[in-house]
């Protein structure tokens, strides 16, 4: 089976938006107009094709990025292949957004015409800047009360610090919004609002003629700056033709010099088709963006993979989902080469082989089996054993690791327990499945209490995972209050000489160990044996190490795991009959418990690196508030029109921060935080914690 669409005719793009900007409705409309969907699902009544997890339909927010393939015939009569990646719009899911931005070539940023640029839009826009993603802006909901296209355009400049390039103007607003002026063709496009109706092309309304001329003039001035020859011609009085103008806008958009702005209302079916034409005309094909960089596994040097079927195969796994019919699905973007069913590939991150069994092309709620896929494709692979999000799969003869995605450490933990015995086993399976899908979610069990602890990126993040457990895996669970992950360590050296003896008829137990416990700079545990002359036989030494390691998980103060301890076995004694590995294990365990007390145990707390991005007006409040949370401000800097405040703050003081920040800045500031290091807890605080956990 040969390639059906040339790679130049692919558009891999996503739609990024604030939580209520109408993204799901827009995606639905796109799927309808591109012929994949016969009945439109409205988020208003909770039935939409792209949001395919129940909670999303209930909460009306998009959580998982589903990838969809569809087709559109452009203005030139040629069909293009669209791969649309749906991205979530809630701040606790920004990890999903980052993940999908990695595999996109371009994006449409949706704005709500009434609200303009909202806080979440700023966050996602910044993430897209980081990956240098070409973007267009669609000002949606033009039919809403208070819709203001011109204010939204102004906010793209003032709030996002980006260059806005309107290529359309709205005709009317709110209830009177009927269509748009196309500033390239200088025609009016109007719609009667019936679903799927084509636009009526007519003359620009007389009362808008001057405004249209003024905006077209601005459009041309910005566009010709992209190209020297066009600039010279323009200065000599030669205007670019409409096709030349489109080519200039395309070039500037792909180079992220400016962002074309369109408008309409997806819900009322006005402005959708011109947006699809703009995707073809302005957003990049895989061949228009720089080749993806990676590390050559054999030489450890940087290498690239061109978007071509002839290049060695390389692909990135960017999402894992559980499908009720197919089981685990790994969504991958093929950057180079050609993938055939049945081949065996190398997972270079894990150093394991994977065989490609079933390959699926996904529509948001249906799927088709395929036998091969090409550079630029986004495919779902069923039944991969080793691959997790962010892994590279490639040709075993030309191994490469495409840039690793970096996932922040979870910052919040809660204890979770099954309601009934029957739920116990199901809960284990459910949590492991969810952790495989989402690298920012971790599961562990607390040795002391035997409780299962789940950790994630925020309170909403964990809420939704617990909810999914209930629905998808039918597990009922009780959830505790959020907790901080404390640690313990020692502050000075201590030497312990401990003898373990037990005699009760038959063979007894005997072991004596002399160990020095001391602090060291790392977080790990170091064990060293300095036994000479066989006072402890070689075969018993691993027992000493194992004994100490087995109790490192619960420190003497409040039962938290120990960090940064070095143990040196310097002497000991054994008995020919009564000594055993087990006896030495028991002796070293007791020696450690005694040693940790003597070596000045102390409590450590996680310190978070907090970055707050806030409008100038709220900087004072933000800094004052961080100081009151035992925070240390490490600096402030200007970023575009906002100010970035960097600080180190104990996690224990960051619970509920999202709400305080929201009210402090009227929802305009955002923050990110990730774990940085552990630090001793101040004495007063430490005593409270010990009381609580004693």
Curated annotation (Swiss-Prot):
Domain of life, source organism: Bacteria
GO BP, sorted A to Z: ribosome disassembly
Annotated positions binding GTP: 17-24, 86-90, 140-143
Subcellular localization, as worded in the UniProt entry: Cytoplasm
Record-annotated tr-type G domain positions: 8-287
Keyword GTP-binding set for record: yes
Keyword Protein biosynthesis annotated: yes
InterPro entries found in the cross-reference section: EFG_II (IPR041095), EFG_III (IPR009022), EFG_III/V (IPR035647), EFG_IV (IPR047872), EFG_V (IPR035649), EFG_V-like (IPR000640), EFTu-like_2 (IPR004161), G_TR_CS (IPR031157)
Principal location listed in the UniProt entry: cytoplasm
Membrane spanning stretches: none
Molecular function in Gene Ontology: GTP binding; GTPase activity; guanosine tetraphosphate binding; translation elongation factor activity
Keywords: Cytoplasm, Elongation factor, GTP-binding, Nucleotide-binding, Protein biosynthesis
GO cellular component: cytoplasm
Family indicated by similarity: Belongs to the TRAFAC class translation factor GTPase superfamily. Classic translation factor GTPase family. EF-G/EF-2 subfamily.
Role description: Catalyzes the GTP-dependent ribosomal translocation step during translation elongation. During this step, the ribosome changes from the pre-translocational (PRE) to the post-translocational (POST) state as the newly formed A-site-bound peptidyl-tRNA and P-site-bound deacylated tRNA move to the P and E sites, respectively. Catalyzes the coordinated movement of the two tRNA molecules, the mRNA and conformational changes in the ribosome.
HAMAP family cross-referenced by the UniProt entry: EF_G_EF_2_B (MF_00054_B)
PANTHER family according to UniProt: RIBOSOME-RELEASING FACTOR 2, MITOCHONDRIAL (PTHR43261:SF1), TRANSLATION ELONGATION FACTOR G-RELATED (PTHR43261)
UniProt name for this protein: Elongation factor G
Organism: Brucella melitensis biotype 1 (strain ATCC 23456 / CCUG 17765 / NCTC 10094 / 16M)
Organism lineage: Bacteria, Pseudomonadati, Pseudomonadota, Alphaproteobacteria, Hyphomicrobiales
């Amino acid at each position: 089976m040969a390639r059906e669409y040339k790679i130049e005719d692919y558009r891999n793009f996503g739609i990024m938006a604030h939580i209520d900007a109408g993204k799901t409705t827009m995606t639905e409309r796109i799927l309808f107009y591109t012929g994949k969907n016969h009945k439109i699902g409205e988020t208003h009544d909770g039935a939409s094709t792209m949001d395919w997890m129940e909670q999303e339909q209930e909460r009306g927010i998009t959580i998982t990025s589903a990838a969809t393939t569809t087709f559109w015939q452009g203005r030139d009569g040629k069909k293009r292949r669209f791969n649309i990646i749906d991205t979530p719009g809630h701040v606790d899911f920004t990890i999903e957004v980052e993940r999908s931005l990695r595999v996109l070539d371009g994006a449409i940023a949706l704005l709500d015409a009434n609200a303009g640029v909202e806080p979440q839009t700023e966050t996602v826009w910044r993430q897209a800047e980081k990956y240098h993603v070409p973007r267009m802006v669609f000002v949606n909901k033009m039919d809403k009360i208070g819709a203001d296209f011109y204010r939204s355009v102004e906010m793209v400049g003032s709030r996002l610090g980006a260059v806005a390039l309107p290529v359309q103007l709205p005709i009317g607003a709110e209830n009177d919004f009927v269509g748009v002026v196309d500033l390239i063709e200088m025609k009016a496009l109007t719609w009667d609002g019936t679903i799927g109706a084509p636009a009526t092309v007519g003359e620009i309304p007389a009362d808008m003629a001057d405004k249209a001329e003024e905006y077209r003039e601005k459009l041309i001035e910005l566009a010709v700056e992209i190209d020297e020859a066009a600039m010279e011609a323009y200065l000599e009085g030669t205007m670019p033709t409409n096709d030349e103008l489109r080519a200039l806008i395309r070039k500037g958009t792909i180079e992220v010099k400016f962002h074309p702005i369109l408008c309409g209302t997806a819900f009322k079916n006005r402005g959708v088709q011109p947006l699809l034409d703009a995707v073809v005309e302005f957003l990049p094909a895989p061949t228009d963006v720089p080749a993806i960089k990676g590390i050559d596994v054999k030489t450890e040097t940087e290498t690239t993979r061109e978007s071509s079927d002839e290049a060695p195969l390389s692909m990135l796994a960017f999402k894992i989902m559980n499908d009720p019919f197919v089981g685990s699905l790994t969504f991958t973007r093929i950057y180079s080469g050609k993938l055939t069913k049945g081949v065996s590939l190398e997972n270079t991150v894990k150093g394991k082989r994977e065989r490609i069994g079933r390959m699926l092309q996904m529509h948001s709620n249906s799927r088709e089996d395929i036998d091969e896929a090409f550079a630029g494709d986004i495919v779902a692979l069923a039944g991969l054993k080793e691959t997790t999000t962010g892994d590279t799969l490639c040709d075993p003869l030309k191994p490469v690791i495409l840039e690793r995605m970096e996932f922040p450490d979870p910052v919040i933990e809660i204890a979770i327990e099954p309601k009934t015995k029957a739920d116990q086993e199901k809960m284990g399976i459910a949590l492991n499945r969810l952790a495989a899908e989402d690298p920012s979610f971790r599961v562990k069990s607390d040795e002391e209490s035997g409780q299962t602890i789940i950790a994630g990126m925020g309170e909403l993040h964990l809420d939704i995972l617990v909810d999914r457990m209930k629905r998808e895996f039918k597990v009922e669970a009780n959830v505790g209050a959020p907790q901080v992950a404390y640690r313990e360590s020692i502050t000075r050296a201590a030497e312990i000489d401990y003898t373990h003896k037990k005699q009760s008829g038959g063979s007894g137990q005997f072991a004596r160990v002399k160990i020095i416990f001391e602090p060291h700079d790392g977080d790990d545990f170091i064990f060293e044996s300095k036994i000479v002359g066989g006072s402890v036989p070689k075969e018993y030494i691993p027992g000493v190490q194992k004994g100490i390691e087995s109790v490192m998980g619960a420190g003497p103060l409040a039962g938290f795991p120990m960090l940064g301890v070095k143990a040196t076995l310097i002497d000991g004694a054994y008995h020919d009959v009564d000594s055993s590995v087990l006896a030495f294990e028991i002796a070293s365990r007791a020696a450690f418990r005694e040693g940790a007390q003597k070596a000045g145990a102390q409590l450590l707390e996680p310190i978070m690196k907090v970055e707050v991005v806030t409008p100038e007006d709220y900087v004072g409040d933000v800094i004052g508030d961080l100081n009151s949370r035992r925070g240390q401000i490490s600096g402030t800097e200007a970023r575009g029109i906002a100010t970035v405040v960097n600080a180190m703050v104990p996690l224990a003081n960051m619970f509920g921060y999202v709400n305080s920040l929201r009210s402090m800045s009227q929802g305009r500031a955002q923050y990110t935080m990730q774990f940085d290091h552990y630090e001793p807890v101040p004495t007063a605080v430490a005593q409270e914690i010990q009381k609580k956990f004693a």
